[in-house]
């Protein structure tokens, strides 16, 4: 049986990336919570850097 998680970087960026988070009110809430907590990476795309673009 095929597994459910078939990773794709583009899909990962588009669904969980910084711009996607910024596009909704709740997404911005997520980012501010992660900033307040002092997370090293705020979102998937910010963690990927130049290699992911």
UniProtKB/Swiss-Prot annotation:
GO MF entry, a single one: structural constituent of ribosome
Pfam entry (one): Ribosomal_L34
Region named Disordered: 1-53
Record's compositionally biased regions (Basic residues): 1-16, 26-40
Stored PROSITE patterns: RIBOSOMAL_L34 (PS00784)
Presence of keyword Ribonucleoprotein: yes
Keyword Lipid metabolism in annotation: no
GO biological process: translation
Disulfide bonds: none
Keywords: Ribonucleoprotein, Ribosomal protein
Biased composition, class Polar residues, residue ranges: 42-53
InterPro entries registered for this protein in UniProt: Ribosomal_bL34 (IPR000271), Ribosomal_bL34_CS (IPR020939)
GO cellular component: ribonucleoprotein complex; ribosome
Family, as annotated: Belongs to the bacterial ribosomal protein bL34 family.
Protein name, per record: Large ribosomal subunit protein bL34
Species this chain originates from: Pelodictyon phaeoclathratiforme (strain DSM 5477 / BU-1)
């Amino acid at each position: 049986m095929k597994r459910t998680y078939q990773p794709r970087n583009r899909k990962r960026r588009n669904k969980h990336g910084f711009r996607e988070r910024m596009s909704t009110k709740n997404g911005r809430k997520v980012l501010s919570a992660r900033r307040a907590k002092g997370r090293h990476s705020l979102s998937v795309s910010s963690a990927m850097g130049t290699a992911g673009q």
